């Protein structure tokens, strides 16, 4: 007999605040569920916010002191002073769909693949991976994990 608590589902909050690019939110949800299983966080919670360049620039300035748009920003709630408040909440990922669209066009890949890559990238930051510390070994480790997860998600590598 199966017990109800064995089938706990992860909470994934997704909000699309931009209007320029149509995003399949159901597909995003399914892929995030799979990613959370792949990184052994199946019972964790995460939120995704899709915005335009203007909004991500405001967030980047407010929280990181960088006055320019970027492709993705992650906020980990599993480390730091608030990590014990709710250990089941991983954090938030904010993605600029404007920047993702431009990057996808430059890389000649579908926007959906670029969005999936940015979700993976943001999730890995939340999980403690880093590439911004001038450590080539950590950067290589993160890039390898990004490629691995993308392949497991899609069944093909992403060349960019």
UniProtKB/Swiss-Prot annotation:
Binding annotation for Zn(2+): 121, 125, 131
Comment on bound cofactor: Binds 1 zinc ion.
Cofactor: Zn(2+)
Keywords: Cytoplasm, Endonuclease, Hydrolase, Metal-binding, Nuclease, Ribosome biogenesis, rRNA processing, Zinc
SUPFAM superfamilies associated with the record: Metalloproteases ('zincins'), catalytic domain (SSF55486)
Keyword DNA-binding: no
InterPro entries found in the cross-reference section: MetalPrtase_cat_dom_sf_prd, YbeY, YbeY_CS
Subcellular location: Cytoplasm
A biological-process GO annotation: rRNA processing
GO MF, one annotated term: zinc ion binding
Family to which this protein belongs: Belongs to the endoribonuclease YbeY family.
Name listed for the protein in its UniProt record: Endoribonuclease YbeY
Annotated organism of origin: Syntrophus aciditrophicus (strain SB)
């Amino acid at each position: 007999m199966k017990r109800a608590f064995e089938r706990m589902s992860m909470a994934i909050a997704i909000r699309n605040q931009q209007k320029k690019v149509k995003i399949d939110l159901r597909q995003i949800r399914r892929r995030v569920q799979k990613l959370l299983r792949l990184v052994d966080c199946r019972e964790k919670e995460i939120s995704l916010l899709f915005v335009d360049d203007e909004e991500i620039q405001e967030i980047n300035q407010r929280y990181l002191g960088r006055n320019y748009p970027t492709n993705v920003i992650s906020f980990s709630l599993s480390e730091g002073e608030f990590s014990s408040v709710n250990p089941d909440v991983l954090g938030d990922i904010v993605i600029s769909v404007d920047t993702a669209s431009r990057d996808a066009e430059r890389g000649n890949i579908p926007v959906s693949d670029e969005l999936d890559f940015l979700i993976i990238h943001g999730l890995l930051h939340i999980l403690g991976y880093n590439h911004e510390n001038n450590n080539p070994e950590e950067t290589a480790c993160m890039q390898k994990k990004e490629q691995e997860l993308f392949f497991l998600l899609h069944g093909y590598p992403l060349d960019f």
